[in-house]
Structure formats: structure tokens, C-alpha cells
């Protein structure tokens, strides 16, 4: 068995490729079912965010398992192999373990230390559990990754002052406004006519950061008015005009700055729409949706300044050097957590031998107990029989305690293998046969 991860992220693929592998809610169950049908996969879960799609799995054979997952990604995305493959990465065993720990800690994020990824890793664990696709190995790994993410944020300064995708989007708007006025600095958004399209979690974060940057009024559009009004109620200090998304054209004509963050699978704004509306001389569009809410052809329209999640790098790079230094604090903790998991993983190699040894001694115990009880005759009471049986079980457990503890203790693979070989020879254990023996129903 091997732990493997296959996927792509903002580091390896542009948004136009990533959006092809964004898994909408309505396709999550089907995706899990298709992955579980793959013979090579023993356990699996999916991490899908705006910046990454990663399949974590326990596979029988690493090469065959990775190829099978790659085939799933090709079929799901509809992309040709020569287009998708250059953007995919895969890690096995130690590298896979280290990768998920780093992802959960925010070290692999566009914004170093951002907190939202931890919630997304928690969701990955929950999805795997809900779809009954996690076994003891991946469940232990992913649960420990969540704990590692929490530990990094509580024991280091990496999470202090970290920005999110939403805050970076607001900062990008401030930066572009400043550059338009000939200044390489962030400007307040007080005078901008702002609109936010979508009323989900990302939009909630957008509103938080817009409020902190001086925005005191905006238009909020959503597919359902109630959800927009519920979100609006959480921000009483902002004057929010809630509209249905049907009013998008009217909103675009009145706004100077529009943020989009919806779950739509196709663009809701394109060049044709922008050409056919009466709008302000300059309209800034910032799209943090994946798949993208704004078509790439919007950039070709005069008077339109359109940005997507990949453009956030301009903002992130302004303070990334300082955050890189903070990330060094987390590396030691991640190495420690990886070592703990791998020691546990290695200790599983002893389980078949321990089970075989326990079974062998249990057979001897039962055989010898039966001989002893038969000699006692009918005068031996049921209570006395229970006492003798408990005594025999206690002796076996005492005999097993020290060798089992030693075998499970942290040690090098070679040392553990040597110990297993000695025990198997001393007790004449046939571990391979016991593994292949069918279980009693």
C-alpha cells in the first residue's frame, strides 16, 4: 500500500486549466463514486478549492494508482493529455505526507499562512467520511494534517496578519486605483461605486475587507434575494442595496468596481454583455470565482480592466518576503508531524506478525487449557473453570506485552524488520499464510 496525491494548483496551472477541474457540489458524489470504483484505490478523498484540485489516496501500486487517477482527471476535465499533464504533480509516501501537512498549514497557499485552506482541508476529511471512502490510513493522515494546521497557527506567527484571497482582491482594487492616480500605493475605496456579485462565504469575506478599507455603501447581487439580505444583515454599518442577479446589466452600468464570487460553472459577464451596456468610462472587474465568473474576452473591451485570481499575485508578492521568513518557523513543526505519522505508518508493518503471534499463542492456550480441564473431571465447577481460563489469558497477555510494545515502538525500518524476522523464526510463524487465510463470517 502507498499514499499518493495527484493534482494541480496555482503553482502549476493557470486559472483557465484549474477551472476545468473545479468540482461543483452537484458532482461531488459522482466523483467519489467514480474514484471508489478504481481497483487500484483503497482509500480516497478530494480537496477542491479555487487554487487547487488534489486527489489524496491509498493505492495498491503507486504507478498504476497515479495513472488511474490521472485518467479520472482527464475524463472529468475534458482536456487532452498533452494540455493537462504538464500541469499535474504527484507525490508518493513521505513526499505526499509532507505535502498535505504543508497545504493544511498554509505553506503551499498563494497567500502564505492564509486560514481558509485549513477549513477546506477539514471539509476534505468530512467529505471522505461522509462518502465512506476513508480507511484507517488516510483518515489518520488527513486528521493529523488538520491538527498540524492548527498547531502551526497557534505556535508560530505565520497566521498573524495573513491575508486571504478575498482581502487580496480588495487590496488589488486599492492598488489599481492608486496606480490610476499615478501612485504606487493603496487608496481608499470611499468614492468607488462598488458591487459584489454572489452571497457565499467568499463574498462575506469580501464585505468584511471592503468595510475595513472605507467602503460604506455597495450593491449586493445574488440568485436569491433572501440570501443576499441575510448577508447584508451581518453588516449594519454598510449601506447595502440587495438585488437579484437579473439586475446585473443595470448594476454594471452604474458601478466603477465589481467583485464576482459565484458558484456559476459558466461566465456570467463577457465582452458582448459589456459592449452592449451604457457604463462608466472605466469599470474594474475583479473575479475570484473558479470556474471564472468573467470571461477572458472581457479584457479586450475598451474601458474595462478585468482581473482574475491569478492576478492577485501582484498584491501577494508585495509582502511575501516577510511572510517567507515567518514560514521558516513552521517548517520544523511540519517535519516533526511528518515524522510522527511516518513512525505510526511504519509500525503498521508489525501488525500482521503481532496478529499471527497472538493467534498462535491463543491456539496453544486453548489446547492446553482444554487438556487441563479434562483432567479436572466433573467436580470442577463452572466458576473454577472461568478462573483458570482468565488465568491462562492473563499469562498470554503478559508474555505478549513486552514484544508487542517493542515492535510498535519508533525505530528504523531495518531494525523493525530484523525484530520481526527473529520473532517469526523463534515462534515458527507463517505470516504470509495467515494474511491470505479467509476470515470467518
Curated annotation (Swiss-Prot):
Residues where substrate binds: 49-52, 109, 114-116, 120
SUPFAM superfamilies on file: Glutamyl tRNA-reductase catalytic, N-terminal domain, Glutamyl tRNA-reductase dimerization domain, NAD(P)-binding Rossmann-fold domains
Keyword Oxidoreductase carried by entry: yes
Binding-site list for NADP(+): 198-203
UniProt catalytic activity: (S)-4-amino-5-oxopentanoate + tRNA(Glu) + NADP(+) = L-glutamyl-tRNA(Glu) + NADPH + H(+)
Pfam families: GlutR_dimer, GlutR_N, Shikimate_DH
Stated name of the protein: Glutamyl-tRNA reductase
Amino acid at each position: 500500500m502507498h499514499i499518493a496525491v495527484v493534482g494541480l494548483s496555482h503553482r502549476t496551472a493557470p486559472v483557465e486549466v484549474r477551472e476545468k477541474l473545479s468540482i461543483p457540489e452537484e458532482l461531488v458524489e459522482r466523483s467519489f463514486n467514480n474514484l471508489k470504483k478504481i481497483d487500484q484505490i483503497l482509500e480516497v478523498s478530494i480537496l477542491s478549492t479555487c487554487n487547487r484540485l488534489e486527489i489524496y489516496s491509498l493505492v495498491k501500486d503507486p504507478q498504476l494508482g497515479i495513472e488511474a487517477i490521472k485518467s479520472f482527471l482527464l475524463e472529468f476535465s475534458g482536456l487532452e493529455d498533452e494540455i493537462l499533464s504538464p500541469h499535474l504533480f504527484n507525490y508518493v509516501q513521505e513526499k505526499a505526507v509532507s505535502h498535505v501537512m504543508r497545504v493544511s498549514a498554509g505553506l503551499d497557499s498563494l497567500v502564505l499562512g492564509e486560514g481558509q485552506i485549513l477549513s477546506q482541508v477539514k471539509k476534505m476529511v468530512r467529505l471522505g467520511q461522509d462518502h465512506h471512502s476513508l480507511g484507517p490510513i488516510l483518515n489518520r493522515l488527513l486528521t493529523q494534517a488538520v491538527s498540524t494546521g492548527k498547531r502551526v497557527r497557534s505556535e508560530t506567527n505565520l497566521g498573524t496578519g495573513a491575508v486571504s484571497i478575498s482581502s487580496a482582491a480588495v487590496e488589488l482594487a486599492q492598488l489599481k486605483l492608486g496606480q490610476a492616480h499615478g501612485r504606487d500605493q493603496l487608496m481608499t475605496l470611499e468614492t468607488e461605486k462598488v458591487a459584489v456579485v454572489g452571497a457565499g462565504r467568499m463574498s462575506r469575506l469580501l464585505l468584511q475587507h471592503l468595510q475595513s478599507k472605507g467602503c460604506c455603501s455597495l450593491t449586493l447581487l445574488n440568485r436569491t434575494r433572501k440570501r443576499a439580505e441575510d448577508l447584508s444583515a451581518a453588516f449594519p454599518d454598510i449601506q447595502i442595496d440587495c438585488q437579484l442577479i437579473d439586475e446585473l446589466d443595470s448594476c454594471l452600468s452604474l458601478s466603477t468596481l465589481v467583485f464576482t464570487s459565484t458558484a456559476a460553472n459558466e461566465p456570467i459577464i463577457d465582452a458582448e454583455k459589456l459592449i452592449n451596456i451604457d457604463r462608466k468610462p472605466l469599470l474594474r472587474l475583479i473575479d475570484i470565482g473558479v470556474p471564472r465568473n468573467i470571461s477572458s474576452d472581457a479584457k479586450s473591451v475598451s474601458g474595462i480592466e478585468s482581473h482574475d485570481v491569478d492576478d492577485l499575485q501582484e498584491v501577494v508578492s508585495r509582502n511575501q518576503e516577510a511572510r517567507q521568513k515567518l514560514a521558516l518557523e513552521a517548517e520544523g513543526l511540519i517535519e516533526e508531524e511528518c515524522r510522527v505519522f511516518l513512525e505510526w505508518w511504519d509500525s503498521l508493518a508489525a501488525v500482521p506478525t503481532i496478529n499471527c503471534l497472538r493467534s498462535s499463542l491463543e491456539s496453544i492456550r486453548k489446547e492446553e487449557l482444554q487438556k487441563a480441564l479434562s483432567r479436572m473431571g466433573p467436580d470442577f465447577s463452572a466458576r473454577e473453570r472461568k478462573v483458570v481460563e482468565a488465568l491462562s489469558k492473563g499469562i498470554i497477555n503478559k508474555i505478549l506485552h513486552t514484544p508487542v510494545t517493542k515492535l510498535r515502538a519508533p525505530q528504523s525500518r531495518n531494525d523493525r524488520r530484523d525484530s520481526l524476522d527473529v520473532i517469526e523464526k523463534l515462534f515458527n510463524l507463517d505470516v504470509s499464510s495467515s494474511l491470505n487465510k479467509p476470515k470467518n463470517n
